[in-house]
């Protein structure tokens, strides 16, 4: 594990200056142009960074292969689940309370003007071009993502500058300890953000490293009074989803939340004046979070795919017995139950009647007939949410049937 200069300053004070000089002047160091920092920024291409970059690309290939094996309903259901989880987690990190239900409602109806519609719609459009070329582009993302909600919730956080904030802002721990002051005045914020964007698009730096550096610099600059964390995590998610499988863009905040102490600590260590502008520790941490996101994603996809194949075999056998001789009905009911099983395993809500009609390509009346058939309805769970019904497969019942046949 990389030992930051902040720790070396205290653990090895006699050699601190020499160690800093060796790191700074190393052939494996990369120096960055960023004016608004106490020291010249740099990082080292460590073995750990090389291993992380290799693992991330390998895991990306694994994710792509797994996604290719997934049926359409499973893939879209899982993407929706990950999107909702990501928004819940990015809000929770900032202490913003939101529920799965209110996020789900906006996902189903993106034109809704309910609370959080901005952030939901922005994540729904993660695959669309949201290029950042200048400071104004960052402000535009912020406006679309969180500003509407912030304006209505906290009048003190309304922006008062030309692009960003005009006044100072401090970053505090949960106990009220001040750990950082964002850049000030606004012309410095704009200058620093412009330089950070240049680093983000640098052809001289590995793109995943550049995204990690930009994520740190965004937190260091802190261009807004509120919403900085959610905006920077969205930007990182967007650029990671361009470089890797798009599902990765819906997993970043989830993994950051799981490693929140290390995440905040890496900011604090890197901000420390004794760290002398060395970004290596932060880069290793952030790439580690990305790598863990991918291993967690692989595990989640593998586990669900194994269960889907397992339940499919049970369904083929059971439905064949229940509708013996009626090949047309066997095919229709098996198709229905396979879709319901996908929605059950790969989402939290099941699937609506309208979506079933769309996916199975049969009329609403026909779908109702299949769902309410006396020979099959014991395998279906109906969840009523106001006027909307969501359907899912009773996987516990399928397990019981399988055990009784063992």
Report each predicted region and the residues it spans.
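FIC/Doc superfamily catalytic core
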Residues: 1-406
């Amino acid at each position: 594990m990389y030992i930051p200069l902040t720790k070396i300053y205290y653990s090895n004070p006699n050699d601190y200056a020499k160690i800093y000089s060796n790191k700074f002047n190393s052939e494996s160091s990369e120096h960055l142009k960023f004016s608004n920092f106490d020291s010249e920024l740099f990082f080292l291409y460590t073995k750990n960074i090389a291993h992380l970059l290799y693992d991330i690309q390998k895991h990306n290939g694994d994710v792509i292969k797994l996604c290719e094996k997934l049926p359409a309903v499973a893939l879209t259901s899982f993407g929706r689940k990950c999107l909702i989880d990501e928004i819940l987690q990015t809000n929770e990190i900032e202490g913003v309370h939101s529920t799965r239900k209110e996020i789900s409602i906006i996902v189903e109806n993106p034109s809704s003007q309910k609370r959080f519609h901005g952030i939901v719609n922005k994540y729904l459009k993660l695959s669309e071009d949201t290029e950042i070329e200048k400071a104004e582009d960052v402000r535009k993302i912020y406006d679309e993502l969180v500003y509407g909600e912030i304006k209505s919730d906290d009048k003190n956080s309304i922006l008062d500058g030309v692009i960003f904030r005009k006044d100072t802002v401090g970053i505090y721990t949960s106990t009220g300890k001040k750990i950082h002051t964002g850049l000030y005045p606004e012309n410095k914020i704009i200058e620093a953000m412009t330089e950070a964007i240049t680093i983000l698009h640098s052809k001289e730096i590995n793109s995943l490293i550049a995204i990690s550096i930009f994520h740190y610099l965004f937190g260091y600059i802190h261009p807004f009074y509120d919403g900085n964390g959610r905006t920077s995590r969205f930007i990182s998610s967007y650029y990671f989803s361009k470089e890797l499988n798009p599902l990765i863009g819906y997993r970043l905040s989830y993994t950051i939340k799981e490693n929140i102490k290390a995440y905040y600590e890496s900011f604090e260590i890197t901000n420390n004046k004794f760290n002398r502008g060395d970004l290596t520790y932060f880069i290793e941490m952030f790439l580690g979070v990305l790598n863990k996101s991918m291993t967690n994603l692989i595990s989640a996809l593998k586990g669900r795919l194994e269960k889907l194949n397992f339940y499919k075999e049970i369904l083929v056998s059971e439905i064949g017995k229940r509708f013996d001789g009626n090949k047309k009905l066997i095919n229709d009911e098996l198709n229905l139950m396979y879709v319901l099983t996908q929605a059950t395993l790969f989402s939290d809500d099941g699937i609506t009647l309208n979506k079933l009609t769309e996916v199975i390509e049969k009329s609403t009346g026909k779908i109702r007939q299949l769902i309410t058939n006396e020979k099959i309805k014991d395998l279906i769970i109906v969840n009523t949410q106001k006027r909307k019904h969501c359907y899912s497969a009773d996987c516990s019942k399928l397990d019981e049937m399988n055990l009784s046949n063992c």
